[in-house]
Amino acid sequence: MLDVVKVLSDLISFPSVNDPVRGVKPSYDIVKYIYEFLSSYGIEVNVLESNGYYSVFGSVGSGEPYVMLLAHYDVVPVDASRWSYDPFKPTLVNGRLYGRGALDDKSNVAAMMVSLVELSRLRLNRKVLFAFTGDEEVGGEYGALHILNKLVSEASLPKYLINGDGANHVVICRRRKIFEVVIEVPKEFEVVRGRKGIKTFSAYYPVSQHAHAAYFIPSVDSHPLICASILIKELGAYVTSIEGKFLKSNVIPSTVTVEYVVPEALGDEVRVDLGLTKLIKAVSTLVRTPIPVKAFSEFGISITPNTYVSDAYKHTLVLDVRAMTTKELLYQAFNEVVNELIPEAKIYVRTDVGGFVNTPKNSRLVKVFTEVLNNLGVKYSVGEGAGASDSRFFTPYNVEVVDFGAVGGGMHGDDEYVDVESLKTLPKIYSEVVKKLLS
């Protein structure tokens, strides 16, 4: 079998960063490398483009499409000053290969590339599709979704999807769907008498540091905006302003500062915002909105208020919601709460066309995966992933999906790495799973 460590090292050396804020997209160089690598072994491969993002797409075998391998080569931005090693110079230390994308997700790209070479040498009675995309870190619309639409239009959907976008040998068969609930409240000013106050709250994670909405634990972690909401309710105060480190809808703000006025008959006259006051008071109730679900999740329902902005006329709060539910059920639940607390508010729900992932543990795909891992002596678990992946685009079409990946650490953080022994086993895992599914 080919040297997967060498292939991954080559992939890491391409700085395929996706950073829309700075207008940075992955360069074509890594696409060319993947294309030429696969082509050199006689594999049928094409490059697809959508909105400036490139996907390497092709197949091995013959007959009807049956199994698909999927992974992404784009990576998140990096602060090189915080790394012990050059993030784009693969560095092998104590059995770990360091580099941006070593775990997420170039280890899977490399493993699948090597696996495809082996599979291409066999007489496969059904077709194995593959795709390596360049926009997973920014939503997947121009990569996985673009390819899905192509497959749907050609009536070429596979029965099974193996998405190499997991980690630590977890056979991920469940993932919640992600929504953004947008609440707009008009500004409404009034002068009141009272005592001014100001309070800054910080996010606190006593168990694990993350700042990602997918990993927020409501009964353990402390969200600064929720704390501010409870303070205002308990004081019976009016809000004059809210400021904070509001970055993205899926990132917990590190700090939130609330300026308020506690009513006092002999206090100073202060102009307050009644609309903002209602909105902030509502936060601590909104995050407990009872949402009907369609399937079990070990993470339950996560609701975090992570983005706030205002303009001349209104305040806008965006809640990150993760649940095994539908857009319609979610809207009904939040609309009931908003109508009760802030009847003048407007509410919208944003989401993509993907669904939640809920492949049964007794499905053929999961069973085959676990059989292969057992046969290879690989320690594993079967469970749920907290975040989203491109698998979600395929589930509405009844494609059985699982996510998987090698052992490693530092995903989206500093000193990202993959365990080399785990990496070396990965191509064999993918090859054996595909062969068993085709048998």
Each model region followed by its residue ranges:
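Acidic/His- and Gly-rich active-site-bordering loop/insert found
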Residues: 1-100, 119-126
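Short pre-catalytic strand/loop immediately N-terminal to key active-site residues, enriched for Gly-Thr
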Residues: 93-104, 378-381, 413-414
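Acidic/histidine-rich catalytic neighborhood of metal-dependent amide-processing enzymes
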Residues: 106-188
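Short glycine/serine- and small hydrophobic-enriched flexible loop segments
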Residues: 114-121, 229-234, 432-435
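Midchain, well-structured core segments that form catalytic/ion-binding scaffolds
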Residues: 152-328
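Active-site-adjacent substrate-binding region
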Residues: 216-243, 281-291, 356-397, 401
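Zn-dependent metallopeptidase/amidohydrolase metal-coordination segment
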Residues: 249, 308-322, 348-353, 367-437
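Redox- and metal-dependent alpha/beta enzyme cores, enriched for Fe-S-associated oxidoreductases
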Residues: 329-347
